[in-house]
Regions:
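TRNA-recognition modules of translation machinery and tRNA-sensing kinases, especially anticodon-binding
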Residues: 27, 135-433
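N-terminal alpha-helical targeting/anchoring segments
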Residues: 1-139, 154, 158
Length: 433
């Protein structure tokens, strides 16, 4: 969400940004919010004048009532002033109700206007225009056929999607045995990896209030992702970023405590009602998964430095697991409305001979802070912090990349050295079938 003052002073820049994001249908919102803002400021100005006059008129009534004891003619004048005081009070009540209504209308529109993207963001309508920046690690081109990832898991008796379908429907799975151990090992390794980078480990709430949802994401994202608890003001989180950033709602953060660097574990729940939907056969896009997340709350001048550092953490972690990756700069049309800048980290799939998304690092500027009324108190006053997020690792997508890149010709799966302590010293997984 932008500052209304910024929109007021830079309407053309806001319109141009909307065009860069290929959201021309939102262009009328700028004029709408400016008209409402002008109407609201007029109401506020009139209300302030009435409040200022209220005390003066009240004093005048008191003075006239005192004079009326000696001069009865003053009583009529006092009653006239009393009538004016009542009329002003009635008008003030009308104006205050109008201000409340206008503020709600303005906020509703403001929540739909996208954040100003960074000048470095490539311009394009959708993810087909995302730009490859660099690659890390040599892509594996095996001389043997790599099965589909669920077939690899099934060779270890490690997954049962049929049973999950009977219990929960499509988009769920049972992980078992070595694959379940591997899943937990990757999460534990990712947790310790971030702790060693200086991040504070946290397990957050897995359900959040509606005002937190509104504060961390757009309505479009909310409709496509979030499960609501029936009869409660609670939503299941789609990522722990939601509850981690929500931790600071309505809070004043001491400047000396910045940056806040947090890494969190949580299950994640998603409706996946967007363009892609859930995957019919595999575990790439599903309704429930677990994830280790990283979140940073920092000074505005430090956010781009943290952005660079955070996506590099993802690259370092994936490379430590012998998975080649590449960085992809997200274009304007692929950025969610709150994002200033974002890049995807994609892992190499030897089976498909192409890369696929496993992480998305995002700088949201002060958008979430403004929505959630977060403030930082420093020597020069208060200001809005910047927020950033990036998945450390999100099994089962990580498992797809891990299994394909560490699969051997005989069906065994090599366990990289960094992961072996989390697998009880196991160096190789041997298929059961």
């Amino acid at each position: 969400m932008l500052d209304i003052k910024f929109i007021r002073e830079n309407p053309d820049a806001v319109r141009e940004n909307i065009k860069k994001k290929f959201q021309d249908a939102k262009l009328p919102l700028v004029d709408q919010v400016l008209a409402l803002d002008e109407e609201n400021r007029a109401a506020v100005s009139e209300a302030n004048e009435l409040r200022a006059n209220r005390n003066a008129l009240s004093k005048q009534v008191g003075m006239l009532m005192g004079q009326a004891k000696k001069d009865p003619s003053k009583l009529e004048e006092a009653e006239a002033v009393k009538a004016q005081v009542k009329a002003n009070a009635d008008r003030l009540a009308e104006l205050e109700a109008k201000e409340t209504e206008l503020a709600q209308q303005i906020r509703h529109i403001m929540l739909q206007i996208p954040n100003i993207i960074d000048p470095s963001v490539p311009i394009g309508p959708d993810d087909s225009c995302n730009v490859e920046v660099q690659r890390f690690g040599e892509p594996v081109v095996p001389d043997f056929e790599i099965p589909y990832h669920t077939q690899i898991m099934e060779s270890f008796n490690g997954i049962d999607m049929d049973a999950a379908g009977r219990v929960s429907g499509n988009g769920f799975y049972y992980l078992m045995g070595d694959i379940a151990r591997l899943h937990e090992a990757v999460l534990a390794y990712a947790r310790d990896f971030m702790i060693n980078k200086g991040f504070t480990f946290c397990i957050p709430p897995f359900m959040i209030h509606g005002n937190v949802v509104e504060g961390v994401m757009s309505q479009t994202e909310m409709d496509a992702m979030m499960y609501k608890i029936e009869g409660e003001d609670l939503y299941l989180i789609g990522t722990s970023e939601h509850s981690m950033i929500g931790k600071f709602i309505d809070q004043i953060i001491p400047e000396e405590s910045l940056p806040q660097t947090l890494t969190s574990y949580s299950p994640c729940f998603r409706k996946e009602k967007g363009a892609h939907g859930i995957e019919e056969r595999g575990v790439y896009r599903i309704h429930q998964f677990e994830k280790q997340e990283m979140v940073v709350v920092c000074k505005p001048e430090d956010s781009m430095k943290w952005y660079e550092q955070m996506w590099r953490y993802s690259v370092e972690l994936f490379r430590s697991l012998d998975i080649p990756v590449r960085q992809l700069e997200c274009c304007s049309g692929d950025l969610a409305d709150l994002k200033v800048k974002s890049c995807d980290i994609e892992a190499w799939s030897p089976r498909q001979q192409k890369y696929f998304e496993v992480c998305s690092c995002s700088n949201l500027g002060d958008a979430q802070a403004r929505r959630l009324k977060m403030r930082v108190k420093g020597e020069k006053g208060t200001y809005l912090p910047h927020t950033l997020n990036n998945p450390v690792v999100a099994p089962p997508r990580m498992l797809i990349a891990f299994l394909e890149n560490n699969l051997q010709a005989d069906g065994t799966v090599k366990i990289p050295a960094v992961l072996q302590p989390y697998m009880g010293g196991t160096q190789m997984l041997t298929p059961k079938q």
